[in-house]
Amino acid sequence: MRVENHSPSLSKLNPPEAGSGDPTAIGRRLSGIRRAPLPHVSAGSDGEAAAAGKIGAFLRKAVAAQSYGLMFANGKLFEATGDALEKRGQYGFSALQRLDGLSRRNLAAVEARLGALDSAERGLKERIMTGAWHFRHQSNAALDDGKTAAIASNHLLARESRSSGGNTFAGDKALLSNHDFVFFGVEFSGRGKQDKPLNHKHSTMDFGANAYVVPDTLPACRHGYLTLTDHFFNRVPGGREAEHQDFVGSFPQMGAETGRWIHEGKYRQNAPIFNYRDMKAAVALHLIEFLRDSKDAAFKAYVFDQAMQSGQALDRVLNSVFQAEFHIPRLMATTDYAKHPLRPMLLKEAVDSVNLPALSGLVSSKGDAVTAMWHAIDKGKDAVAAHLLGNWRFEAGDFASAPPGFYHELNYALSEHGASVYILDQFLSRGWAAVNAPFEHVNSGETMLDNAVKYGNREMAAALIKHGADRNLLSEWNGGKLDALLA
């Protein structure tokens, strides 16, 4: 994925209709906005700095409205709970008002359940609300250039046709439609961004070898929202599922209690969401609610003693009782970040994420390059294949058999569902694959043209015919379908 490194720009800005009187009208007409850190303004130009700050704040708010509009108007959950917005092409600031209303309602719900807090609980709430948080995005992709980190949402990447894959699935999009946000785990310790994160997993998942850490004071965070769990699968992993087994093992009763769904209302998947203003109070009050319900006296004593004094202890508590997830609208672009390698990256991960700098460091022999090419074939990664073709000399014999871990022969892999036509064309052009060679294992006797027809891949079928594929070799199931596919 390439890194965007430019100042905010508008590819299209339609002015509000004359006499509309709607201050949010311009926000609804914004489209094609890209954001990056504003250019540096010298200390002597205070007026310019103030103006630039106001423009940047407005653009962030306008973009955030589109992200929330997409979520609230299209997520089936919000329709079920009566919180949906009307679908439209562009969204005004009412989308942000919807977030604020939900946040207030969810905060009021836990406040009502708790009633008055005692002095120890008030102290704990104050401790959490005054603490400095950091947000952690884990990935295998190359998301920075050493000076600027630019992390885009799934929606933005797809719109610009530069996605290298991700962790947003059809179920997330259908239920929540929150794929125009960048997702982060939360570090509660108060340590600086330059300190290595204390947590390397989120809801039991390892999302990448590198962590990009930003402070909660970042302007891009101000229109974000927080959930106490993974927003889609809003269950806290408990006991043996928890990341920090040494900590959870010290409080077995607490470990048994943490594995739970956190939701408001009758729908189990209705994870409460909180805006930036309310998020710290929400975490504090939900922790107090958990403590009141807990039967683990030792854990409660630890919270009101050790966690009040130690940032690391507080982080262990909050990342065991919750798995908080923070969401920044559309794009997080900043120079105020730190990158932390958490573990060595695997070759497969570098290919899957199209991280060419990391791939170059991992491929030190022709054998490595061949394995990387098989991964590129398997995942349809054109950029990786082009990189390898430009840096290594291959022969047909290099691909005669698949490396360990790959289960399809070359011809089948090159024409499998989702395979890259570019990579197929490169292999056929170089004579590394025989266009009419029958499969020997899966669907024995069929050819690559059968796969192209079976999967309805017109572009692949045309490429195969260009390279001499014999339609007479098509199986009886596919023989009559080729002309219709090519029509």
From Swiss-Prot:
Per the record, what is the consequence of mutating residue 454 to A? Answer: Abolished interaction with host CASP7. Strongly reduced interaction with host CASP3
| Chain sites annotated for binding ADP-D-ribose | 139, 143, 152, 154, 157, 166-168, 183, 207, 230
Q: Which InterPro entries match?
A: Ankyrin_rpt, Ankyrin_rpt-contain_sf, OspC1-4
Quick check: keyword Secreted in the entry? yes
- Which EC number applies? 4.3.99.-
User: Which SUPFAM superfamilies does the annotation name?
Assistant: Ankyrin repeat
Protein family according to the UniProt entry: Belongs to the OspC family.
Q: What is the name attached to this protein's record?
A: Arginine ADP-riboxanase CopC
